[in-house]
From Swiss-Prot:
This is Aspartate aminotransferase. It comes from Geobacillus stearothermophilus (Bacillus stearothermophilus). The modification N6-(pyridoxal phosphate)lysine is found at residue 237. It catalyses: L-aspartate + 2-oxoglutarate = oxaloacetate + L-glutamate. L-aspartate binds at residues 38, 124, 174. The gene is aspC.
Amino acid sequence: MKLAKRVASLTPSATLAITEKAKELKAAGHDVIGLGAGEPDFNTPQHILDAAIKAMNEGHTKYTPSGGLPALKEEIIKKFARDQGLDYEPAEVIVCVGAKHALYTLFQVLLDEGDEVIIPTPYWVSYPEQVKLAGGVPVYVEGLEQNHFKITPEQLKQAITPRTKAVIINSPSNPTGMIYTAEELKALGEVCLAHGVLIVSDEIYEKLTYGGAKHVSIAELSPELKAQTVIINGVSKSHSMTGWRIGYAAGPKDIIKAMTDLASHSTSNPTSIAQYAAIAAYSGPQEPVEQMRQAFEQRLNIIYDKLVQIPGFTCVKPQGAFYLFPNAREAAAMAGCRTVDEFVAALLEEAKVALVPGSGFGAPDNVRLSYATSLDALETAVERIHRFMEARA
């Protein structure tokens, strides 16, 4: 059957593709270490699991309002006030089936055919695909490695055209782990305000920061920036709830209303049980969040030091999220590979280590390595990469 043109140009997720390949090799009996996962390796905290069981036992298994349970919206509003000093009303918040769905719904209600969305590179793999599905045009602005993968106000200004509708800011970043400072965000925000460009602020990794770095939301810097920003967030990364699929968006009422109307015709509502679990995530103890953050920071410090000792790898030390994003161009050449993609494929085939090629993130010289797995597995993986390089060099 002939499929719709809008899906013909879709690029499959690089992260999911490598994860599936690793699973296939494992199923065939190979000892594969997968470092492609974009999710914490910890279980969801117990008080959240208990809240979900309680909700089921109390019969909270029916439809909810399309925009989310009022009680969950209230907890999200309290979270914004507590963490960023931001004041939102229920009509300015929508609960979605994960942060990915919040982004998808936002672009569907925001973009007309040919509207442009500025996407800094390296980027999360789904940004350009979601923009294209909504009829939009991704416009890439390169975040240079020597600038810690951050874009400058001058770069942003040069990329804006009469068709520019929005810019995506992802801090802490997937895949690089970089974090914009308040001063850097303010400078980018001033450009957006001057040109009437909506800011889409993806803050899903906000709780995962290291080395004293702090997450700042661009919306908290001024009332004007708040009015021109849609924040995307969720409980997936902070509370190890990736499979529960609860994310949300907060922003101008007209945008949130349009998103809610669209959601009523697509998903009806996020899963009721997961919403009750998310209420417990935000209203309950936050110690598990900090414990996970500390574990990730310990892994980062150990594995970063080991990785940069491998010939051919250079890496900007990340300040957040749970990924390393080293430049592997020289390593690939030393291993006799023409491209980094070929290098990643050889690593999986010969060393049984699954990394994600940076080409899927708009950075073909890099690879993404997730440290959201056990320290033993990480150290073994780096040892295998080292041995692979020694054998190939």
